Each structure stands twice: as structure tokens, then as C-alpha cells.
Amino acid sequence: KGCARHIYTSNEQPDISKTPLPLWSLIDMKKYSSMNIQYSRGCPFNCEFCDIVVLNGHKPRTKDKDQILAELKALYNEGWRGGLFIVDDNFIGNKRKLKAEILPAIIEWSKKRKYPFTLATEASVNLADDEELMQLMVKAGFSRVFVGIETPNEKSLDECNKFTNISRDLVA
């Protein structure tokens, strides 16, 4: 027999692949400048100041291409055209899957519909090291990527375990 608690916890992260399609018909899309979807949760990095790994874990958990395409289709069928923010904490946490499956599927889907969405997301600065990934993102319709750059000072980055920006010229 169970009893009510103040806080409920789990040892497992939620399975993002079981997330249902949003019910876009419940909102008045005319009142929004952008819609949001999520492809992944979690981040492979361990920056001291960031709570993402505490909330969502180190291993990026992702939706599959069919889920992403179903979400795009649902938005499209509801009449949405315009900004679409992919709200992942680090969209490029699983680069291999993005390049092999997700981005090619988005490119094909978007091309058939004359690119109805202008995509934006958040990514780690190491996106700049992957020309192929950047080109695929552009082809998919990404026009903006928010990149968190805390400081160009390597000592400060080292103090907070932010190793992704070390030995990188962020000032130039």
C-alpha cells in the first residue's frame, strides 16, 4: 500500500522515445512567434556550473527520426510556418546519429514542403569543429545556433571543468 510523499524520485531517466506528440490544436498559434520541439535530453559534458547533467544525465537520449518527422508533420498540418526552436540543451550531443539519420531526414522532409520552418537550437562550441555537421544543419534549415561561451579565460574555464572551450581562440 502506497502513501503520498513530498518528493517522488526515480533512479532512471525518462525514456524520451515514448514522449507523445504535442497537441498543437490546443493552442492559438497566432499568439506565438516560434514553436518548440525537443530531439534529445542530456549532455556528454560535465561543466561545474551546469545543472543539465543532474536533471537529464550525461548520456544524450534521443528521439528517432520517425518521431521527429511526426512532430514536424503535426506542426505543419496545424498550419504552422516560421520559427521552430529545437530546445535541446546540446543539440549535437549525439553527432553520429544527427549526421546519419536525423538531419538527412529533416532535409528531405523540409525540401518536399519548401522549407516551412526556420530552425534554431543550442549547441556546444565544438560544433565549429565539424564542417560536415554545420553544412547539414544549414541544409536542414537552421539559421541560428545559440552557443554558450562563458569566458575566453582558460584558467576560469579550467576552474569550472569547462574543457570543451580550452585551447580554443574565442577572442579572435
Which role fits each region the language model picked out?
Residues 1-15:
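Glycine-rich beta-alpha loop elements in corrinoid/cobalamin-binding modules
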